[in-house]
Amino acid sequence: MLMVLLFQRLGIIMILAFLLVNNSYFRQLIEERSKRETVVLVIIFGLFVIISNITGIEIKGDRSLVERPFLTTISHSDSLANTRTLVITTASLVGGPLVGSIVGFIGGVHRFFQGSFSGSFYIVSSVLVGIVSGKIGDKLKENHLYPSTSQVILISIIAESIQMLFVGIFTGWELVKMIVIPMMILNSLGSTLFLAILKTYLSNESQLRAVQTRDVLELTRQTLPYLRQGLTPQSARSVCEIIKRHTNFDAVGLTDRSNVLAHIGVGHDHHIAGQPVKTDLSKSVIFDGEPRIAQDKAAISCPDHNCQLNSAIVVPLKINDKTVGALKMYFAGDKTMSEVEENLVLGLAQIFSGQLAMGITEEQNKLASMAEIKALQAQINPHFFFNAINTISALIRIDSDKARYALMQLSTFFRTSLQGGQDREVTLEQEKSHVDAYMNVEKLRFPDKYQLSYDISAPEKMKLPPFGLQVLVENAVRHAFKERKTDNHILVQIKPDGHYYCVSVSDNGQGISDTIIDKLGQETVAESKGTGTALVNLNNRLNLLYGSVSCLHFSSDKNGTKVWYRIPNRIREDEHENFNS
């Protein structure tokens, strides 16, 4: 009878656990153990442990069972069989020993007052269960987020054994004989089920993120050639067709700030390319630059009353934080936008904005009066881009977190590259961020192959030409070390030199032949891995910006190569100054 009643209580806890784990906010909480997350977890599991106490089964002094809906108080001579230890154990495994001990204290204190100020030992035993369960759980986790099923069962048995030991000492072993087996089974099964539900949700989320990242990368790969042409009706139509072909949306559209550029799918009869943007939803997104989701026709607000589009997500496309258009995805019929579609579209919009910025920068460079400077500043090595994309694609299958990290580093590299395409000079902080993003991607491709270090005695707001470090670091990565797999060191140094700063990049590579070194920076060379064009352009930019005193210098022997130049000792006063001449 006791076992049946306890399983009923377990069912209550499992229903609450399912509702809790189904909440995305709770799943986000358990990924970090900061003070804020700890407090929220304590509140949640504190409520659970109180519910466990008041839904328990009262055991009278004659060992008869009393079932009441809610046990607010019991006689000091009576005992209680409940799921308190189960909740404390689960709290410890999810939040660690700190959360487990506090939840145990809450449960023990509540049990003390529930028992008419008797059973103070429950406070000590419950706190001890929380600490021991949390410590053992942390020890067993190793590289996994949570212990395995067998380990959870072991922890549950240990936790319940601690509780039974206190009950036996302070209440009597006859009671322990009556409840120990049901409580052991209950605690082990409940903890296992709770963790299984949680791990299933987390695993599904991780797989979903990996699939989303893969989809975004595939669409990025296919749309790149079109978006770099800019937002034109032709490029927009090609992009919309690709998105429509690879997703389950019923309609896809692209606009500039005023007109529809392309609309593929349902609604193409009245959302016509070349005509003004019709829906209030799209107009508001373009106006304030904030993404919006509509789950019904009224929210879309299309003036055509026969429009079949029923839900939509509209995301702004931005270049340098200015909205230049909108990406629109629609469902028809009864389908609504889920979090999956929302994340996909937001990710696509960020990538598309970067691609548009790349294309516009290239076009502006062709028309700029300082084309020689602009051309180099806007260059993004296509081989580096596609190698990085392939690396990320490979990481998706084995480590989605590393794939997201690589994608963020690639995004940082593109952003700083595009900023360099707009500015004549950047701060040392910006250039160093560019170098770090480049090296982080390279290190993901070739773990442990390169070691980059800095020795800088200059303010972060010191100004230097865009790519003034990145070109030299990339040159070392591509040419200095040949096939050597390890012990490849690159050192970036910036030191005061009178009214100048001396900027140098050195490596411990295999050196440069005498026939080539005299040509570097002056003219292109015939080499299998490059022509030295980037060095020539950098040298020309240094001359144009600062004069011949700042030209590139090279020294090399069998122990490595050093490249250096000098720039005036001036600190940038306006961080947002753009070179628009």
UniProtKB/Swiss-Prot annotation:
GN (gene name): lytS
Gene Ontology, cellular component aspect: plasma membrane
Physiological role: Member of the two-component regulatory system LytR/LytS that probably regulates genes involved in cell wall metabolism.
Top-rank lineage group of the source organism: Bacteria
Residue span(s) of domain GAF: 231-355
Catalytic activity, EC: 2.7.13.3
Name assigned to this protein: Sensor protein LytS
Molecular functions (GO terms): ATP binding; phosphorelay sensor kinase activity
Catalytic activity annotation: ATP + protein L-histidine = ADP + protein N-phospho-L-histidine
Transmembrane segments: 4-26, 38-57, 86-108, 115-137, 152-174, 179-198
Topological relation to the membrane, as annotated: Multi-pass membrane protein
Histidine kinase domain ranges (all copies): 356-571
